[in-house]
Amino acid sequence: IISSKSAAAKRAGVQLRAVVTTSLTEFPPEDIVVIIGNALDNAIRAAQESNGKTADLHIQPQGAYSSILVANDVLKPVLTENPELNTTKKARMRHGFGIQNMRKAVERNQGMMRFYESNNRFVCDILLLN
C-alpha cells in the first residue's frame, strides 16, 4: 500500500516521506489498507493543494500500541472551517466514506484516532492496541 500511495503522490506532485519501524502484521490486512490507504489519499489530496506539497507517514511502536501518524501540509486551517471533516468533493453522494471507514477499522482493533493541526500541517494520529 505504501509503494502504491508513494507512486500516486509522485504523480500528484507531492513528496511522500515514510518512516516505518514496526510491522502491522498482527492486524487484519483489510483494516490496515482501509486506515493507511484512506489517510494517505486524504493527505496527498490536501498536500497537492498546499504550498509545501509534502506528506509524511510514520508507523512505529508506542508502548502497548502501534502508532500510525499521517501528516500533510495545508494551505489553510481545516478543522476550523470543517470540524466534522465532511468531504469537499463535488460528488458528495459517492465520497465522504473514507474517514467513517477508518474510524470503524480503528475501533475494530481497539484503537483510537484523532485529528489536529500544528504548524500549517494537518495530522491524523492513530493508535492500535497490539
Question: Which residues make up each language-model segment?
Answer:
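Heptad-repeat coiled-coil segments of the DHp/HisKA dimerization-phosphoacceptor module
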Residues: L16-T22, P61-G63, V74, E117
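Short beta-strand/loop element within the Bergerat-fold HATPase_c
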Residues: S50, T54-A64
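Glycine-rich/acidic phosphate-handling loop/turn and adjacent ATP-lid/helix
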Residues: S66-F97
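Conserved ATP-binding N-box helix of the HATPase_c
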Residues: P29-G52, A105
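Conserved glycine-/histidine-rich ATP-lid loop and adjacent helix of the Bergerat-fold HATPase_c
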Residues: N101-G111
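Glycine-rich nucleotide-binding loop
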Residues: K76, S118-D125
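Conserved short strand/loop->alpha-helix "switch" segment adjacent to the catalytic nucleotide/phosphoryl-transfer site
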Residues: L16-I36
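Short beta-to-alpha transition helix within the HATPase_c
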Residues: I1-A12, S66
